[in-house]
Amino acid sequence: MKLIAGLGNPGKKYERTRHNVGFMVVDELSFRHQTPWKKSKFNGMTSEIIVGGEKMILVKPLTFMNASGECIRPLMDYYNIPIEDVVIVYDDLDLPVGKIRLRQKGSAGGHNGMKSIIQHVKTQEFNRIRVGVSRPLKGEVIHYVLGDFPKAEQPDIIAAIQKSADAIEDFAQTPFIEVMNKYNQK
């Protein structure tokens, strides 16, 4: 069993924002597999998919970004999912729009959702997919990440969401290191 967490903020107001690209990836997986979202007792929405015989629990924390770990850790404990079977998907300002980067460990890199998860799981060594949203040319980062993708960026971000979902489906049957090597070269 795997736990795939897409990070974002709950509510219509944030639905299509850069900061919610993690939600968009797990929504894509739920859509592909035609599985419903259900409210979890761990302050999140969950959906279960089966890929190649492997159950994957998709989660969208409802805690708001900065408290994502408060949802992830209890789900890991409840389902007895080891850290190596967890993937966190989130937005990254340091990658160009549409680029994805898979890693098995690393710091939070200034991302508050990742800081919360690292604090709650007590390690930086877990799988993650960073989805590029780029940096603003000027202005405050907070307004930028809480803004929607402009029309010109939509084809690139849609491709990145689909590629991220493909990588997660591959992870059902393939060690993350191999998935990482495959998708980081594209």
Curated annotation (Swiss-Prot):
Family membership: Belongs to the PTH family.
Residue positions binding tRNA: 14, 64, 66, 112
GO BP of this protein: protein quality control for misfolded or incompletely synthesized proteins; rescue of stalled ribosome
Gene Ontology terms: cellular component: cytoplasm
PROSITE patterns membership: PEPT_TRNA_HYDROL_1 (PS01195), PEPT_TRNA_HYDROL_2 (PS01196)
Top EC class for this record: hydrolase
MF annotations from Gene Ontology: peptidyl-tRNA hydrolase activity; tRNA binding
Reactions it catalyzes: an N-acyl-L-alpha-aminoacyl-tRNA + H2O = an N-acyl-L-amino acid + a tRNA + H(+)
InterPro entries: Pept_tRNA_hydro (IPR001328), Pept_tRNA_hydro_CS (IPR018171), Pept_tRNA_hydro_sf (IPR036416)
Site for Stabilizes the basic form of H active site to accept a proton, residues: 91
Subcellular location: Cytoplasm
Function: Hydrolyzes ribosome-free peptidyl-tRNAs (with 1 or more amino acids incorporated), which drop off the ribosome during protein synthesis, or as a result of ribosome stalling.
Pfam family, one: Pept_tRNA_hydro
Listed name of the protein: Peptidyl-tRNA hydrolase
Source organism superkingdom: Bacteria
Keywords, in A-Z order: Cytoplasm, Hydrolase, RNA-binding, tRNA-binding
Quaternary structure note: Monomer.
Active-site residue numbers: 19 (proton acceptor)
Annotated site residues (Discriminates between blocked and unblocked aminoacyl-tRNA) in this chain: 9
EC number from the UniProt entry: 3.1.1.29
HAMAP family for this protein: Pept_tRNA_hydro_bact (MF_00083)
